[in-house]
Amino acid sequence: MKKTLMLLAMVVALVILPFFINHGGEYGGSDGEAESQIQAIAPQYKPWFQPLYEPASGEIESLLFTLQGSLGAAVIFYILGYCKGKQRRDDRA
């Protein structure tokens, strides 16, 4: 019980603490940072690929990114669960 409460308190702290550490800060993301680094290293560089779909806003882009990550996690954990169930079935037989 004590271990569970300690772990729960740590999870809550990890969720709430970032709101107070850099309050009002801006998160630019890695794409913008990579673009600025490329421009600093090789200003003549021209991208060789254009996106197939450009989201209307940053919120929609974040939504699509989150959905992609969620779908990937669902597939991975489905496969892990399937393999675990198959292993248990084989152990019982």
Swiss-Prot record:
Q: Which InterPro entries match?
A: CbiN
Q: In which pathway does it act?
A: Cofactor biosynthesis; adenosylcobalamin biosynthesis
Under PANTHER family, the record lists:
COBALT TRANSPORT PROTEIN CBIN
Q: Write out the GO MF terms.
A: cobalt ion transmembrane transporter activity
Tell me one GO biological process term.
cobalt ion transport
Keyword Transmembrane helix on entry: yes
Q: Which family does it belong to?
A: Belongs to the CbiN family.
Q: How does it assemble?
A: Forms an energy-coupling factor (ECF) transporter complex composed of an ATP-binding protein (A component, CbiO), a transmembrane protein (T component, CbiQ) and 2 possible substrate-capture proteins (S components, CbiM and CbiN) of unknown stoichimetry. Expression of just CbiMN in E.coli confers some cobalt uptake.
Q: What does this protein do?
A: Part of the energy-coupling factor (ECF) transporter complex CbiMNOQ involved in cobalt import. The complex confers cobalt uptake upon expression in E.coli; can also transport nickel with a very low affinity.
In which compartments does the protein localize? Cell inner membrane
What are the entry keywords? Cell inner membrane, Cell membrane, Cobalamin biosynthesis, Cobalt, Cobalt transport, Ion transport, Membrane, Transmembrane, Transmembrane helix, Transport
Q: What is this protein called?
A: Cobalt transport protein CbiN
UniProt superkingdom: Bacteria
Q: What stretches pass through the bilayer?
A: 5-25, 63-83
Q: How does it sit in the membrane?
A: Multi-pass membrane protein
Q: Name one GO cellular component term.
A: ATP-binding cassette (ABC) transporter complex
Q: Which organism does this record belong to?
A: Salmonella typhimurium (strain LT2 / SGSC1412 / ATCC 700720)
Signal sequence range: none
What NCBIfam families has UniProt attached to this entry? cbiN, PRK02898.1
Q: Name one Pfam family in it.
A: CbiN
